[in-house]
Amino acid sequence: MVQRYQSPVRVYKYPFELVMAAYEKRFPTCPQIPVFLGSEVLRESRSPDGAVHVVERSCRLRVDAPRLLRKIAGVEHVVFVQTNILNWKERTLLIEAHNETFANRVVVNEHCSYTVHPENEDWTCFEQSASLDIRSFFGFENALEKIAMKQYTANVKRGKEVIEHYLNELISQGTSHIPRWTPAPVREEDARNQAGPRDPSSLEAHGPRSTLGPALEAVSMDGDKLDADYIERCLGHLTPMQESCLIQLRHWLQETHKGKIPKDEHILRFLRAHDFHLDKAREMLRQSLSWRKQHQVDLLLQTWQPPALLEEFYAGGWHYQDIDGRPLYILRLGQMDTKGLMKAVGEEALLRHVLSVNEEGQKRCEGSTRQLGRPISSWTCLLDLEGLNMRHLWRPGVKALLRMIEVVEDNYPETLGRLLIVRAPRVFPVLWTLISPFINENTRRKFLIYSGSNYQGPGGLVDYLDREVIPDFLGGESVCNVPEGGLVPKSLYMTEEEQEHTDQLWQWSETYHSASVLRGAPHEVAVEILEGESVITWDFDILRGDVVFSLYHTKQAPRLGAREPGTRASGQLIDKGWVLGRDYSRVEAPLVCREGESIQGSHVTRWPGVYLLQWQMHSPPSSVACSLPGVDDVLTALHSPGPKCKLLYYCEVLASEDFRGSMSSLESCTSGFSQLSAATSSSSSGQSHSSSLVSR
C-alpha cells in the first residue's frame, strides 16, 4: 500500500533570498540533522543570465532501524538523489528527491517547494509532499513502512527548526537582508544571440523535467491551503502525520464535493474519532455528509423552532463555560419526563431538538475559539441524575435514547470534551448496562461519575468548573435558567391518530406483548436465569382493570416443554400443587397497579433458576394473600364473561457478565462511584421494595 504525506504550508516570515541563504547552509553536511551523513554534487548548471541554478546531489542518510533489519538489508545508510531547481527571477525553489538504494524494492518520491507568500512578498512559504511504496523487502514490509514513516515525519519537524536555526545564525552574523536578483545589462551582440534558436537540451539535461509538472501543480498557491500557523492557532497542535491526514482528507473533499465543504475543525473531529486512520475517517465523513444533506441538517438552526412544550419541559440548556473555556451544557435528566415528552411531541421532534443542541454546541465552540484565541473544539455536559428512577427505563424511551446516541456518535464525533454525571442513583447502573454498548470507547473515557454528594468536595466539580459557574441547585453560586422539567400533563399527549401518523403506535406495539388477566387466571412469564447477579427489567402498561404484580423464584422448572435456555413461556405456569415458601418464593413484594398506570422496574437476581413475573386481578387484601387459585376458580374464569384486565408488557434480562462489566466501566470513570456500586450490589441480597415505579 502506498503511504503518502502532505504538509501544510509552513511560513517563514523572512524574504525568499534570506531563506535560500539559510537553506544552502545545510550542505554538504548538517550537524543539526544527525541522520544526514553528507552530500556531494553530481551535476550543476546555470542559465546564461544566472536566473536559474540547477544542482543535482547525492545524499547519504543513516538508517535508523533495528540492527537485525540493517543486517538483513546489508546496509548502514541509504542514498537519495536530490535535484534542486532554484529560480531567482521567479523566486522559487523546487526540490525533487528519490531513493537510489533498493530502488527495485522500495520507491520513495519527495517534492518540496519554497515560494513567495501570495499576500506578503517578504515572507516565504514551504510545502512538502512524499510517497512511499514498499514492493518487497525480505518479508519486513510492514516493519519497514512504520520505520520509514516515523523517521520521515521526525525529519519533517526537524527541517523547519534547522532553517530557523540558520536564519538566526545569519542575522546574528549581520546578514539580515540579501538583495533580490536583477538581470545583468545585456549588450547588443548578446541580445542577438539570445534571440536565436535555443538548444532544448540546455536545461532539460540537468534533471527529470517530465516530473516537474505534478510538483508545480501540487504546490501552486490557490488561496485555499492550510498553513501551519493557522493549524496551531485554530485547530491545536498536530503531529506532522496528523497534519498530513487533515490535508489529504480536505483535498479529497475539495475534489468530490464541488460545493461547500465542512469546516476544518469538523473534518478533524472525524480523524480523531478514528485515531487518524485516513480511510476509516473518510468513509465515516462521507456517510455523515450524505446524512446531513438528506435531512438538511445544515439549515437546522435556521429552520428548527422547538415546540413551546419542549421549551418548558425539556430540562436542558447552555450555561457559561467550564474551566478550560469549553461551552457548558446542563441536562437535568432525572427531572425530565422522557415518556411524557415522547407521548406529547414524538420521537422525531426530540431527535431534532438533540441535533439542534449539537449544532449549537459546534457554533459555540467556534465562538470560544475566536474569543479565547486558542482552539476549543468540544463542549462539556453536566448531567444531573437526581430523580432518575424506573420510569426512565420505559422501553420505547430507552430505544429512542439508543437511536439518539447512535446518530450523535455517527455524525458528531469528538464534540463532547467531558461528561460530568452527578447525583447518580442506584438505578443508574441498570440504565448504563442498556446504553453503554452503544457508546464509543473514546467517548466513555470522557465520563466522570459522582454518586451522592461527593461532587461537592475536592476532585469534584470544582476541578472542572469555576465556583461562580456551578449551578445553584448543586450548591454553587450561579443562578441557572435551565427549565426544571417535571411531569408532562397527559392532556398534552398526542391523540392516537397523531401517534399513528408518526408511526409511534406501530413501533411500540412491535416492542410489547399483550396479555389478558381473568379472575382466578393470572398471566405469568417465565424467565430462565443461568447465573446470579443478572438483572431482570420489566415495563408494562395497564390498559383495563386493576392488577397485582409479583415476582417469584423457583428452582423447579414449570411445565415449559422443551426449549432453549433464555427463551420464555407465558400463560399460567405455576403448578397447582406448588406451595409458596417451599416450592417457590416471592422475591418482590406484591404491587397493586391501577388502570392507566405505567410501571417500570428491575431486580438484581441472587440465584440462578426460573423467575416468574405474575399479573393477577386485584382483589381485596384477603384474596391477594392467597397464592394459588383453585381449580373451580380457573374453570369459572375461563367460561364466564366476567371482568377482564388487559395489559401490555415487556421484559428483558441483562446478563450477569454484561452487568458486572458495566459496573466495572462505571467504577473506572471515578473512584467516587464505588459507593453507588456497593449500594447496587447490596440491593440484590434481599427484596427491593423500591425496584418498581408507578407512573400515575
UniProtKB/Swiss-Prot annotation:
Q: What Gene Ontology cellular-component terms does the record carry?
A: cytoplasm
Query: Which segments constitute the GOLD domain?
Result: 509-653
Q: Taking every annotated instance into account, which residue ranges of this chain make up the domain CRAL-TRIO?
A: 306-482
Q: Which residues form the PRELI/MSF1 domain?
A: 2-175
Superkingdom of this entry's organism? Answer: Eukaryota
Q: Spell out the residue ranges making up region: Disordered.
A: 178-214
What's the protein name?
SEC14-like protein 5
Lineage start: Eukaryota, Metazoa, Chordata, Craniata, Vertebrata
The gene is SEC14L5
